[in-house]
Amino acid sequence: MPQFEWVHAAWLAMAIVLEIVANVFLKFSDGFRRKFYGILSLAAVLAAFSALSQAVKGIDLSVAYALWGGFGIAATLAAGWVLFGQRLNNKGWVGVVLLLIGMIMIKLA
């Protein structure tokens, strides 16, 4: 396992934030009909992967990727709710709960 340092956690947090930003810009792009937002989305995805590549220097890839994806999904869900009024049905909430349980289990492993 790589040597953990807080800087790697900061890179992971940055990757998560950039993924959320990319997803919001993607929604604003309206299927890339609004090219400016589409380009911003692509730039944010590239920056997110760059930050993730720095994070995995000190965090196992399996843990970093699972946390990046899980927190990204949960936070994008929250952003969709706040910014766009999107809601989940009961099956969707079950999925979110299972996702969170899985992230906790990975962190505790």
Swiss-Prot record:
GO cellular component, one term: plasma membrane
SUPFAM superfamilies (UniProt xref): Multidrug resistance efflux transporter EmrE (SSF103481)
Membrane topology reported for the UniProt record: Multi-pass membrane protein
Any one of the GO BP annotations: glycine betaine transport
Cellular localisation: Cell inner membrane
Domain of life: Bacteria
Pfam families: Multi_Drug_Res
Transmembrane intervals: 6-26, 36-56, 64-84, 88-108
Record key words, sorted: Cell inner membrane, Cell membrane, Membrane, Transmembrane, Transmembrane helix, Transport
Family membership: Belongs to the drug/metabolite transporter (DMT) superfamily. Small multidrug resistance (SMR) (TC 2.A.7.1) family. MdtI subfamily.
PANTHER family assigned: SMR FAMILY PROTON-DEPENDENT DRUG EFFLUX TRANSPORTER SUGE, SPERMIDINE EXPORT PROTEIN MDTI
Subunit structure: Forms a complex with MdtJ.
Protein name as annotated: Spermidine export protein MdtI
Organism of provenance: Citrobacter koseri (strain ATCC BAA-895 / CDC 4225-83 / SGSC4696)
